[in-house]
């Protein structure tokens, strides 16, 4: 007998091995019809057809559950493959993973897909869904899978199988009628669960993300549990399109990117004002929190990166250069440099914690297909800091950082924050005991802060677990920003030591921390969060003064000088244009305040104040307006 325990504590007994779907049928036909997959003993998800061969706790996954979304999206990717192979039999399927809010499928085709092709593929998917067919899973021996894909000419699937270790002797093959694909699953049991989908765009990609390899075509899509969720998401996409930081950046003359420097940003004067304002704000955070700001070299001999572990775990993402028979790496991270500063002199336990901060410029060799405006670049600057402390100080330091980070996010207008702990990955440095201690320290710190968090198994960095801060923006999108990581490994690898109270040398704990992360990415997020309507303290131009006629020329200059002397970012528009034209132009540029001066304002020593939201605040004295501006300054 096999006993299945359900989430409400009730139990069902079966004569022998039983599938998730059979359990659902035993409970009722309504649940069986809604069953997508199952979760066994609170752990991994399994297909509805998978057998349970021992006593277990079973949670049946339906479209109402959050876990269903990834299953639906992954199944939709396979449905793309089914439709593409019916319409374009010569195409070769590559990979089709789930991504945030959707999925994509990489495909090799000699003929480029067009928007008309995308519409045809989507229509064929609709037709296939209407057939209401079952998705059938077979666990298949590796050699049979190889034979299957050879017969079908799926060269990329064969390459993926070659990448698998010899321990993989069988794999899941999912049958969509005549179309087959391999996957770990789980997938939906029937196409009726896939009705709420949309294909969104086509882009280029490269096999294995390497520009030296053959080019692929990537079909993006989104899928949801029902049509209402899909429509809400499509509306968010429209809202996001209006907020696209690349469009706003061009319209406001903030930055640009060009082919000669892929993933490298050219900052224009207005954009650099925003950068400097944020940098000065973070610099104040450093100072108030006891960090010493430093600066480390851009390139360092590869021997240091070999010692730190980056060479073995990260070299494919690094840039290298040679000089005088030595190989140097352009730094992808700042941490090894900070350890070198710590190592200049022997520290006592009384000196700890020691906190370093740097606006560290890093470079990472990201695949060209992954680059996206400011949000995914190759050259970036981090508000990077490292704390050297004892194990006993970890909780206090993480707690202080947590409170500091929440204040920073609030100052930038983010209130909805989710906290996650990313736990040990398969590929990592150090032993299990060190990881146990590091993960326990992060949990203890968050418990002390009385906050809730989610745990992400396998998503930590190779040198330590980390706390992640995920922020929701104005249209509900989630962005991962700040992190703090416990690292017991790197100080030992790079020889960092202090003398403890017993006069013995010990390795400090190293905490890696960043609040905004990449400055480039953070500014891109802010542009989209604010939709280009900057809060006054961040706006590249805070005020524009516009005269109505030449008769107010000198008075406008006086107002301009008075505001400049107060430290505000002010422009003056003395052009011989109609005042309505000037107002429209500067309103479209989203300048927070427009001060109009005519004969009445000149006579009374006032300014007529308008906002970029077209609100008329009436006449104010210059001193009253200055007080208003000062209340809106964060730095």
Curated annotation (Swiss-Prot):
Residues 1-62 form the TGS domain. Its EC number is 6.1.1.3. GO terms for molecular function: ATP binding; metal ion binding; threonine-tRNA ligase activity; tRNA binding. NCBIfam families: thrS (TIGR00418). Its cofactor is Zn(2+). This is Threonine--tRNA ligase. Transmembrane segments: none annotated. SMART domains: tRNA_SAD (SM00863). Zn(2+) binds at residues 335, 386, 512. It comes from Xylella fastidiosa (strain Temecula1 / ATCC 700964). Binds 1 zinc ion per subunit.
